[in-house]
């Protein structure tokens, strides 16, 4: 096992530059003669040789309000019917326990997909009108938090 050799070409030798003409990479170290690429540092990203760069030629445009956008975790009445019993409270913590929402969503919106047959008391951020009427018809309660 310790006498195994690497296949040919698997381990490349490191380039040692600037160590005399006999090495093949002496004097200019494989960088050619003069010019920007022969110098020590390369120009910064977006630099176009002194010409006004593209990012300054084009106007700034647009606006995004995504950082302040409210995102709701959507829960359907059918899902609540499957996971909850009569008289139970449906809020952020109980929905999290039953894995109907993920942790990152703090706001909950209830939609009317599916059938609700159990009386539950909802403590949510938002609820659709049809979902609200279905919950009230059964005799459940709604508290907007």
UniProtKB/Swiss-Prot annotation:
Record's compositionally biased regions (Gly residues): 19-33
One GO BP: translation
Gene Ontology MF term list: rRNA binding; structural constituent of ribosome
InterPro entries named among the record's database cross-references: Ribosomal_uL15, Ribosomal_uL15/eL18, Ribosomal_uL15/eL18_sf, Ribosomal_uL15_bac-type, Ribosomal_uL15_CS
Keyword Nucleotide-binding assigned: no
Gene3D superfamilies documented for this protein: 3.100.10.10
A GO CC term attached to the entry: cytosolic large ribosomal subunit
Keyword Transmembrane helix recorded: no
Family annotation (SUPFAM superfamilies): Ribosomal proteins L15p and L18e
Keywords: Ribonucleoprotein, Ribosomal protein, RNA-binding, rRNA-binding
Disordered, as annotated region: 1-58
Subunit structure as annotated in this protein's UniProt entry: Part of the 50S ribosomal subunit.
Similarity section: Belongs to the universal ribosomal protein uL15 family.
Function of the protein: Binds to the 23S rRNA.
Name of the protein described by the UniProt record: Large ribosomal subunit protein uL15
UniProt organism field: Borreliella afzelii (strain PKo) (Borrelia afzelii)
